[in-house]
């Protein structure tokens, strides 16, 4: 089921609409939510949990699990320009926890999806287009890398 919620700033007006499951065209999803749906669909061997943690700043968006490799985390980012923006807490997380943690970036204009190691965060802050990725637009390869026993797969 899909609920659309629109709030008008300045005037306290909330419009809550229930839309049938099969008519999602009336609900607009944020680009990060669309990326989340794409990740779930294209990585079936991974059990995903989307984290919306306001109490632990910097924690990545996704917790992944597979019986063979255990847990790992992924940050989802939408690139609207050459630089990817990260909060100071996100930067600290990826710099201090580079093993088994990843960053998945989707280019907003081209739609390309790229997988990066956490250690690539410094390059992503400058220009994601010039930062070497582990995989581009190859979901089978992305899934294999996420499931690899070591982050240097």
Regions picked out by a protein language model, each given a short descriptive name:
Residues 6, 11-53, 67, 152-153:
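Acidic-basic catalytic patches of nuclease active cores, encompassing PD-(D/E)XK
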Residues 58:
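Beta-rich catalytic cores
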Residues 62-64, 70-80:
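Conserved catalytic cores of phosphodiester-cleaving nucleases, focusing on short active-site segments
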Residues 67-69, 109-110:
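Short strand-connecting beta-turns/loops that link adjacent beta-strands
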Residues 79-97:
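Mg2+/Mn2+-dependent nuclease catalytic core
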Residues 95-122:
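Nucleic-acid nuclease catalytic cores
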Residues 123-128:
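Acidic, Ser/Thr-rich peripheral helices and adjacent loops at domain boundaries
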Residues 131-153:
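Charged phosphate-binding loop/patch that engages nucleotide di/tri-phosphates or the phosphate backbone
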């Amino acid at each position: 089921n899909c609920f659309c919620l629109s709030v008008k700033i300045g005037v306290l007006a909330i419009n809550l609409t229930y839309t049938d499951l099969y008519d999602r065209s009336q609900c607009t999803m944020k680009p990060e939510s669309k990326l989340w749906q794409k990740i779930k669909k294209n990585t079936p061997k991974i059990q995903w949990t989307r984290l919306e943690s306001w109490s632990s700043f910097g924690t990545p968006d996704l917790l992944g699990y597979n019986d063979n490799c255990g847990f790992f985390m992924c940050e989802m980012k939408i690139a609207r320009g050459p630089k990817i923006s990260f909060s100071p807490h996100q930067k600290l997380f990826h710099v201090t926890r580079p093993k088994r943690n990843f960053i998945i970036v989707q280019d907003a204009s081209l739609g390309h999806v790229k997988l990066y190691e956490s250690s690539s965060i410094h390059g992503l802050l400058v220009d994601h287009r010039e930062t070497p990725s582990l995989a581009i637009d190859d979901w089978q390869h992305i899934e294999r890398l996420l499931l690899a026993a070591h982050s240097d797969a």
